[in-house]
Each structure stands twice: as C-alpha cells, then as structure tokens.
C-alpha cells in the first residue's frame, strides 16, 4: 500500500457509497482570521456543519492538506509532523451513526480495501456524564458487526467527545477505531488508552448530535452531522508495517536526497537521524505553503513567520549535519516526486518555490554572519566568561540567532551561557505567544459573526470597484477578515493614487446606498465562468459552486456567508493601501456604522 493508493482507495470507496468528491482547500484559509493555517480536515467545512448548504450535496469525501505549528519543536521524533493529509468523509444531515460505523467497518475489513482482520479491531465510545447519556447506540452498531463487548471501551469526555469550539456550538460524541498491532502488552493493564504502541488509532468518527448553549445545556440537533478523519501518513506507516512515518514513501525520496547532500546515512546515528527528519518535514511543509499561496512569503508576522521559522530551522539542522552550502532548492524535486501527481500546484510553481527558498536561505546566511558580529561585540564587554540569559535571548529574539548557534560560538570563544536564565526568558516569550495564539483560536475555527459577514460582503464590492477604477487585470490574491477590518490583496503593480482610492470608496458606498440585494445560486463551475463570475486566482473548485450576485454589480464564486442587502454595511472607508509583495497591493478597510 502506497500513499497514492490509499488516497485513491479511500476516495473510490466513498464515491461508491454515493459521496461526492470535493477538492481539498488551500492550507491558507480564506476569510478566516482565527487560524493561520487549516489544521484539520473539518475546518474548511465548518460553515456547512453549522447549516450552510453545500453546493455538492450532503454526502462528501475529500483529502485535506493540513499544517499544525504547535508542535514544531517536537518534530524530529518518529511521529510528529508539521504538514500532513487528512482523509475525511462527511454527512451533512444525510445519515448518522449506524451508516457511518458500517461504512468505516467495511472499508477497514473488506478484502477490496484495507483487509484488516476483524478480530484485531477495538473501539471506544462515549461513556456519558451527568448531562449527556452514554452512547449505547454506537456501541450496539459495533456489536452487530461482530465486535465483542470486551473490545468496546466506554471512555470519558476527554477521550470520546468533540467540541464545541469555544464555549458554545455544535458538538457530540465520537467513536475511535483501533487496530491491535500484535505487539506484546506493556503490562497487564495495557489497553487502547495506553501509549505503548500496541494499539494503533486508525480512524475517528465524530457525531455532531448536540448544540451547547450559553448556559451549558446540550440540546439535541435537528440536523445531525458526521465528520470522520483518518491521518494518511500515520495509516500508511501502519499498513506498511513501519515504526515511523519517516520510513514510508511519504519521506523516503526526500531523505535519500538529504543523504546525498550531507554524506550522512539515515539509520546509523540518532542525532543525525533527528536532523534529517526535521529537514525533510520542514522543507516539505514550506513547499506546500509556497505552492498554495503566492501571498505568503517569509516574514516576521503570521503565516510568513511560520514559513520563515520552518526554513531557518531546516538550515540550522542542516548545519549540524555538516551541510555548509545552499541546499533547500535541491530538495524540491524530491518532494514533487512524491506529491506532484496529486498536487499539481507543486509542479506548476516549482520554479517559484525554489526561488523563494533560495532567497530566504541567502537572507539567513547573512543573519548568521550579522549575529556572529553582534555576539563578538556583546561578549567583548562582558565582565565574566558567562553570557547572561537575557543577552542570549536577545540574540535569539532580536537578531533571529538560534540558541544552538550561540552555544557553538560561546564554546569557540571560551564562554559559557546561563542556560537557566535563557530558558526563563524563552518560557516567558512562549507564554506571551501562546496567549496570542489562544486568543486567535478561541474565536472559533470560523468566526462567522455579523461583523465579519458584513466585511466579507464589502470585499466583493471592493473587488469589483478596483476593477472599474484600475482595470480588468485586478484579481483577488487573498483576504483576511476580522470583526474590525478587512484586508484585501490584489494583482496591481503600482501604488494607488489618492484620487484612485477616493473613486473606489465612492463606488463602494454608492452600491451600499443603492440597497442592492445579495443572492446565492448553486451552479456548475463552467456555467459560472460563462456568466463572468470572478473566482479566487489559483484556487481549486469543485464542479458545483456557490455563486453570490450583488444585484447587477458583482458576481463571484464564493462559499459565503454574506448579508442579504448592501444597506446593512454602513460606510466603507479605506484606511491603508500598500505593497504586499512584488506585483501585489494590499488594502485595509473598515465599515463605519450609520
């Protein structure tokens, strides 16, 4: 079983069960200010799980690219990944627990698909609590399929309950499916909750059955949904009998290339192996970010900061392997070899990806040189041979100088570092960053408030107004919306004049004043294109799409949501117009209530 074969088997199975295959979304979420990247297969589908009508129907299947940055420092072991793929199938009110469980069981055990022995399957269900009853319904389905009671575990909310995101919203019990790997039990008490590796969690089916209200009550939903997820890389490792995802075809070509560049052989020395795993993971993630969005480039903010960190961490660990020359672009072909047949954007943007990686690589080499000069300058005036923690942290935080490099220089110049002091400053920095991250995340996976909905509609008016003022070459390259403002990136090579900005504002505000209705239609993509509907440049769309028309003024392919009439928007005001990147301009704008 290979990466490509498992993807295809999963999609083909659910298509045979009348599910419609939808395209996975970009890693960079569109119009979702609450997260930097799509972190789960269900994230792009949140509006539809909350009640929006999906243009492709109520039974869906897809493969979603995901990127999680919370565990970047953990990457390097045998299991953690930054970039990964999630296989998922969805029911938006079409079916519920029984059919979901039966489909999962068939895919896992059928000789036409994964052919896993039924006798090796274990499952868990929600045990219930004071507010929500035990999920005996799911347990009975498993029993009917031949899973004995002693292999059905009833576990707490911490194990078998999903959501809500934030303090209220859709949520429900889940059932997790495990496979006995055949390893010896670590103890007499060893079971599916144990982390020894005997039991492999292969699938998770979430049943969105309740809505939690502001008072903490769980109310049964009329329209119940199913969201399932199977991690592609982890499942491939299990099916191939490998102890690590890095020993599979998801990584082998990259690792082989690193071996050639470094002269090190993977599997001979653990310190070298860890470096190789970090490089292969981080460069892969960086390639997918760059392939997905020409708006994101290495920087010190948001998505750009994550991209920069991935690239620079790769360079740092390459240095430990003894790689002294530029090497990042040399790995892109290996990544394309693995993924290019399924993700053609890697092939289409290969030259761009190589250029961006090489540019950032060159910048970091300069940073290392400047950091060394700063190190010499600082240590020259120290009263002792110990570098205080705050100074070591300053080199890290202000100059982007990795601690490990400071440590190497300290050894070279005969200094020690107050590591305890550095760690204290670093932990404070992490807490501050985490608070900021939590603030973003707790807003929900998709912040569909009335304020953001108004601003989303305003971006459609802005897009059309920019075309009328600047020309038809204007195309949206990305947007970001919070409750306070919109940010809109578009193709245009020159700075806008004050007169052009004024004209755009006047056009948008005229459409607001004219009280134009906003209507949604579902049609085939080809039909939308014939009608002249604008679409996000570079985005992949399903055959059936949602199209929003602002009465005779604007027509765009868009997932929504939007207000019903432009008179709900207030007054549109552009606060700032600036360069985003080469050939891309950025506008920040607000709506002022009447």
UniProtKB/Swiss-Prot annotation:
This is Alanine--tRNA ligase. Transmembrane segments: none annotated. It comes from Borrelia garinii subsp. bavariensis (strain ATCC BAA-2496 / DSM 23469 / PBi) (Borreliella bavariensis). Gene3D superfamilies: 3.30.54.20, Bira Bifunctional Protein, Domain 2 (3.30.930.10), Threonyl-trna Synthetase, Chain A, domain 2 (3.30.980.10). Keywords: Aminoacyl-tRNA synthetase, ATP-binding, Cytoplasm, Ligase, Metal-binding, Nucleotide-binding, Protein biosynthesis, RNA-binding, tRNA-binding, Zinc. Consists of two domains; the N-terminal catalytic domain (in this organism this is shorter than usual) and the editing domain; the C-terminal C-Ala domain found in most orthologs is missing. The editing domain removes incorrectly charged amino acids. Its main location: cytoplasm. It is found in: Cytoplasm. It catalyses: tRNA(Ala) + L-alanine + ATP = L-alanyl-tRNA(Ala) + AMP + diphosphate. The keyword Protein biosynthesis applies.
């Amino acid at each position: 079983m290979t990466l490509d074969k498992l993807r295809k088997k999963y999609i083909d199975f659910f298509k045979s069960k009348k599910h419609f295959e939808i395209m996975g979304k970009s890693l960079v979420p569109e119009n979702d200010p609450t997260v930097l990247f799509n972190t789960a297969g269900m994230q792009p589908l949140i509006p539809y799980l909350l009640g929006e009508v999906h243009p492709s129907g109520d039974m869906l299947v897809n493969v979603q690219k995901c990127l999680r940055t919370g565990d970047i420092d953990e990457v390097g072991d045998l299991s953690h990944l930054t970039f990964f793929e999630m296989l998922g199938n969805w029911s938006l009110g079409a079916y519920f627990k029984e059919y979901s469980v039966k489909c999962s069981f068939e895919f896992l055990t059928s000789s036409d698909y994964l052919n896993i022995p039924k006798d090796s399957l274990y499952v868990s269900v929600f045990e219930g609590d004071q507010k929500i009853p035990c999920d005996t319904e799911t347990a009975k389905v498993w029993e009917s399929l031949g899973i004995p009671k002693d292999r059905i575990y009833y576990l707490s909310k911490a194990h078998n309950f999903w959501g809500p995101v934030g303090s209220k919203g859709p949520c429900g019990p889940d059932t997790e499916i495990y496979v006995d790997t055949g390893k010896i039990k670590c103890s007499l008490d060893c079971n599916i909750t144990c982390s020894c590796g005997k039991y492999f969690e292969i699938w998770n089916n979430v049943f969105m059955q309740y809505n939690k209200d502001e008072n903490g009550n769980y109310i049964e939903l009329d329209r119940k949904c199913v969201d399932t997820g199977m991690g592609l890389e982890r499942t491939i490792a299990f099916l191939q009998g490998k102890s690590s995802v890095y020993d599979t075809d998801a990584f082998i070509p990259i690792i082989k290339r690193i071996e050639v560049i470094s002269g090190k052989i993977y599997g001979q020395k653990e310190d070298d192996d860890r470096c190789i795993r970090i490089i292969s993971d981080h460069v892969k993630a960086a390639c997918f970010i760059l392939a997905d969005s020409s708006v994101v480039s290495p920087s010190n903010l948001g998505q750009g900061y994550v991209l920069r960190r991935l690239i620079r961490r790769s360079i740092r660990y390459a240095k430990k392997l003894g790689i002294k020359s530029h090497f990042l672009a040399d790995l892109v072909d290996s990544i394309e070899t693995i993924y290019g047949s399924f993700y053609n954007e890697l092939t289409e943007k290969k030259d761009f990806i190589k250029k961006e990686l090489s540019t950032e690589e060159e910048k970091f080499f300069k940073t290392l040189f400047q950091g060394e000069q700063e190190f010499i300058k600082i240590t020259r005036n120290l009263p002792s041979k110990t570098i205080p923690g705050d100074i070591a942290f300053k080199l890290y935080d202000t100059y982007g100088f990795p601690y490990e490099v400071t440590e190497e220089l300290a050894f070279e110049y005969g200094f020690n570092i107050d590591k305890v002091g550095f760690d204290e400053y670093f932990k404070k920095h992490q807490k501050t960053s985490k608070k900021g991250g939590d603030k973003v995340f707790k807003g929900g996976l998709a912040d569909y408030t009335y304020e953001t909905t108004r601003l989303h509609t305003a971006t459609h008016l802005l897009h059309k107004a920019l075309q009328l003022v600047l020309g038809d070459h204007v195309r949206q390259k990305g947007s970001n919306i919070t409750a306070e403002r919109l940010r809109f990136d578009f193709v245009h090579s020159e700075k806008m004049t004050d007169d052009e900005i004024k004209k755009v504002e006047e056009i948008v505000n005229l459409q607001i004043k004219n009280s134009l209705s906003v209507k949604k239609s579902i049609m085939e993509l080809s039909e939308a294109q014939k009608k002249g509907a604008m679409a996000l440049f570079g985005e992949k769309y399903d055959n059936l799409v949602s199209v929003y028309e602002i009465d005779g003024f604007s027509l765009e392919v868009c997932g929504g949501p939007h207000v019903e009439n432009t008179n709900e928007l207030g007054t549109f005001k552009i606060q700032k117009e600036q360069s985003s990147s080469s050939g891309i301009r950025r506008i920040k704008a607000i709506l002022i209530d009447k």
